[in-house]
Swiss-Prot record:
Domain (CTCK) ranges: 38-127
Name the record gives this protein: Neuroblastoma suppressor of tumorigenicity 1
Organism placement in taxonomy: Eukaryota, Metazoa, Chordata, Craniata, Vertebrata
Gene that specifies this protein: nbl1
Disulfide bond annotation, renumbered to this chain: 38-88, 52-102, 62-121, 66-123, 85-126
GO biological process: semicircular canal development; semicircular canal formation; sequestering of BMP from receptor via BMP binding
Protein role: May act as a tumor suppressor.
Family indicated by similarity: Belongs to the DAN family.
Cell location: Secreted
Length: 183
């Protein structure tokens, strides 16, 4: 009985690994009552810098449970490696400049920090790089801070495909290049 279950598992996982370069898995045959989920949850993020007054901004964090599995391999290898890893991570983001008041600092009266705002999250490959297509890059300079778009209310569990965008006016924004601080 155990060998039969293992054989079925190997067959199911082998078919899944052949389906697409990296298909999102919402359910596994061994756990039909469990499903993957990934949501963008509202948070308050504190943006700070040494010598500056920290600012609180509304942002989102990705939270969820996505599937991963690894089936023991053989040597020499008789089948494709049966390893899959998904993680709940941003599917769509935008960048904005947050200006901090540093009136007590000798270096500068203010510092601009580049902050990633999360719009949507989804289960995606653990090996996904942040520069991959699907990221929405919009940089909002501090001069137009009052015109920033608000975060959408709806959350999505599927990847949102967007295009890389950057206006010429964004190139004029001053960015703080120091290592990010906690928070």
């Amino acid at each position: 009985m155990v060998m039969c279950v293992r054989a079925v598992l190997v067959c199911v996982l082998l078919e899944l690994s052949r389906a697409a370069p990296h298909a999102h898995i919402n359910r596994l045959a061994l756990f039909p009552d469990k499903s993957a989920w990934c949501e963008a949850k509202n948070i308050t993020q504190i943006v700070g810098h040494t010598g500056c007054t920290p600012r609180s901004i509304q942002n989102r964090a990705c939270l969820g449970q996505c599937f991963s599995y690894s089936v023991p391999n053989t040597f020499p290898q008789s089948t494709e490696s049966l390893v899959h890893c998904d993680s709940c991570m941003p599917a769509q983001t935008q960048w904005e400049v947050v200006t901090l008041d540093c009136s007590g600092s000798d270096e500068a009266p203010r510092v601009d920090k580049l902050v990633e705002r999360i719009l949507h999250c989804s289960c995606q490959s653990c090996s996904k790089e942040s520069s991959q297509e699907g990221a929405l890059l919009q940089l909002y300079p501090h001069e137009g801070a009052q015109d920033l778009p608000s975060l959408p209310d709806a959350t999505h569990t599927h990847p949102q495909h967007a295009h890389m965008q950057a206006d010429q006016r964004d190139a004029d924004a001053h960015l703080d290049m120091h290592a990010p601080e906690a928070g």
